[in-house]
Amino acid sequence: MNTHFSNLHKSIVKKHFLPMATAVLSLCAASSMAQTYNNPVIQGVADAGCMKYAGKYYLGGVATYGDFFVSSDLVNWGERVHVFDFDNQWTKGTGAKNNQIHANEMLYSGGLFHLLFSANYWGKDKHIVHITHAVSPSVTGPYREVRDDQWFENRIDPMVFRDDDGRLYLYMVKFTDGNTIWGRPMNHDFTFSGDAVQQFSSQPGTWETYDNRVAEGPFVIKYRGRYYMMYNANHTSPSFGNYRLGVCEASSPLGFGPGGKYSWPVVGPNTESIDDTHADLLHYGSGHWQPLATDNGGDTGNASARIMRFNLASVPAGNVYLKLIQRGGISVKINGHAINAGKNSDYQLYPINHSWLKKGVNTLVIEQPKEGKGTLSSIALYDFGNEKADDLLVTPGQPNIVRGPNGWEWWLVYMANKGWQRSQYIDRIHFSNGRMVVDGITGPNTAGFHPAPSKPQYAGTSIADIPFSSTTYLLELTMSSAQREQGIVIGDKTVLLPDSMARNVAHEWRIEKNHNLLTVWIDKVLVTQHQRVNVTDNKVKLLGDSNNYHIDHAAYNEGFDEYGPYFSGWDTLTAGTHGLALAKGMWLKGAAANNYELSVQTDDNDATSGTYGVMAAYTDDKNYVSVKIDAAKAQVVIDHCVKGKTKMVVKPLATEQVVYPDVKYTDSFEKQYRFDSDTYVNALLFPHNTPDNDPYAHDLGIEAAVKEHYQADVASSQEIAWLDGDTWRPLSTELATSSNPAWQRITFPTVKTRGLRFINREATDMHRNIYRIKVGSERQTVNQLRVERRGKDIHMYVNDRSFGVVTLAHDVPTRCGLLSDGAAKVTVGNVLYYVVN
């Protein structure tokens, strides 16, 4: 029997807690002993599919040639096994072989493993761009096509979603309106039960159409009663660099449409975020915008060379980097100093020696190779200050969303490019205020806290050794039995395998016990939903003779996930339709632990007073760490109490955030930017670079790269209004100083609103003028608070924005929970908690 325990009893056996007597409060970037990971996790693999089964992950697709990579932790993929060979009647005699296997989809259903993928062969002999379907009784194959005389469906990027009622849906991409996402219902045997239904195509005039009309790579999950589809938009090629991941929400599996799309990409190239926060010194080195003075560089001996001149008011004292995006062989010199750009196409940030720069006029010489094949796509110069630059990472795509090893976390497995090399990456998915948020794109040098996937506290092939010491936990079982009546027993509740499910084959059980509420899925079918259970102990037992069951995999992890009316175990607090109503006091839930995550959504209903939040770490009333929101002052208050003495740190909630027009309220005549909750807004920022000439929106050559695309005064071109209830009111603004000269900033008296509207002031002005802008806000009424404790370090976040790290002097077990002073009417919409291993 393979059994693994880790820290399972740690919070139980330590009855006497060490006080946090010599703990220290640190709100700077603190080092953490938590295990991290380095992207990419698999080099050289592009469009792929990923499946979790019985505690292992299987990944295959482009450049795996019919193989699966295998991992137990999403990070290490050393095992590789061959599972499939492309050999059928409809590809015979063509060049469509194993190298044409694209965009795998793998899943387990009723004793069979299913492999779907798209052949993507555009040969001179034949075009073979179809989806096929193969099966195997073993996860490691060999897989055989169900029919070898014809393909399964058209055209690319298959994904099969099983709803919690057991119904199956195939999502795919057809070449109808550009690349368009469609969905089609299926029977349990993977035959079709209805016609395909168009979901959506890419939306003109948005981030989805920076180049081509492409919507592809759909992946669907259901979480907390909502359906989420992640997808790709724009051309996949790194020569464009525009590929991004978006999300669409729906209330039904075939109900995805333009109105459900997030207005923004959830994962994009980090080149964009650099320009959002750093001014390009080639244009703004003098403190204000200046055009690049260019001329022909024939005197260099290369007629295709260009000379660019830029002005610096002073030589930057920080870390300076030159961004160079080029397609092979570009040569660059700064004031005569050569940049070793290499001969290959690449996205790079090159560190620049301060001695190479000078106050006043500086010169860039850019030469193409003499054969004239090199192309410059983008060039910029940045002052990063004390920051170190990350690698330039672009074209995130082909998403797969899987549960992490501990069963609580969600992880995104996807491809991305570092330069021109495409590989597999992983990043954590969070749900913040109901929205899907991705902690990425990340590389080895990405700033911030990016812990590795958490492992289960117990993993093995038996449940007999699990103590079930907590009243809240997740148990995952992959097991089979020949018994006609088979299932599990918890307290007074028996959950049976439905008659419609086959016997004597493995089934995947997901059992969530949240105090006295029980939820069970079998093969992703919801068979028990938040039913009350009375227990004398918390153990899960197998129905009948346990010797008649074969357990392939069991994983146990303490924690709970609750939302809406499904709260339990909070003592005197009660839940309504929309969540848990906070009263005055403090409430703790779960055993003490040394490593955990707590994520809480709060809605203060436009409170004008009161503090509320989370108890991040609690030993006793004289030793704790709390993170609270002060509604009246729009602040985050962090209290660290040691032996009754409290050290308080206060940070403003105010932020400036990039927003995109909401397509539901936007057309060619006006743009509306909407907020999910009431937001207190007091500033707007507009990029001086025109959205019609975004350098990331086109396949640029050197001439286009240096062309002037500057708008001196964006704000005055717009009539701006804010939404007051259901009434639009004009916004009275004034010009303000911007910390980034690449952005124009205007301010106004704070307004509480859910929307802003922009209309071109001149009726004859048909330009876009604005698209991506920044909104400055004091606070919002709905917030997601998250704490991640890893040993001594407690990382704190509000709306996925870091508010620092508290570092304890001793790694002692603590509890966590909710708190409020009772002055604000606060509703807790969801809580996710789990012990981290």
Per-region residue spans from a language model:
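Hydrophobic core segments of beta-strands in well-ordered, beta-rich domains
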Residues: 46-65, 102-123, 145-148, 157-184, ...
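Extracellular glycan-recognition regions
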Residues: 274-286, 291, 386-387, 434-661, ...
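Surface loop/turn signatures of beta-propeller and other carbohydrate-active proteins
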Residues: 34-52, 75-107, 123, 140-162, ...
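Aromatic, loop-rich ligand-recognition surfaces of beta-strand-rich domains
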Residues: 560-561, 606, 653-732, 737-779
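Beta-strand-rich ligand-recognition modules
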Residues: 303, 317, 325-384, 502-504, ...
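Short beta-strands within extracellular/lumenal beta-sheet-rich domains
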Residues: 294-313, 464, 595-597, 655, ...
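Edge beta-strands of jelly-roll/beta-sandwich modules across compartments, strongly enriched
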Residues: 371-381, 549-554, 764-777, 826-831
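Short beta-strand-plus-loop segments that form exposed binding edges in beta-rich domains
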Residues: 365-373, 417, 543-547, 758-766, ...
